[in-house]
């Protein structure tokens, strides 16, 4: 399906849409919660999905990984067969990384 992202407070869910809440599915947290690391004095953020690597098969994979920080949202799309990891530039000191599993929904980690 389609996803709509709303940044900021007091944003209403559009009619006909369902609001996703991160980390609420009954699935293995160690394979879904993003792990965030910074590199090069904090100027690069590395995000990977799971402390145990998530599968990347056509029937079960991470569709995208996103960084929400400093009022912006950057989304990196993945396909089956790709490692569930990516890099973000910018050096944000705080933020939230989201990952979307095609079977188990939305997951997040704040740093």
Q: What do these predicted regions represent?
A:
Residues 93-103:
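Short, aromatic- and glycine-rich surface loops/edge beta-strands on solvent-exposed regions
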Residues 61-71:
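Extended low-complexity, serine/threonine- and proline-enriched intrinsically disordered segments
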Residues 21-32:
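Proline/serine/threonine-rich low-complexity linkers at boundaries of modular beta-sandwich domains
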Residues 8-21:
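Cysteine-rich micro-motifs
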Residues 102-110:
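Short acidic/polar inter-strand loop motif in beta-rich domains
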Residues 49-57:
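Short amphipathic, basic-aromatic surface patches that mediate peripheral association
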Residues 69-77, 107:
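Surface-exposed loop/edge segments in extracytoplasmic proteins
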Residues 46-49, 84-91:
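Exposed aromatic-hydrophobic patches
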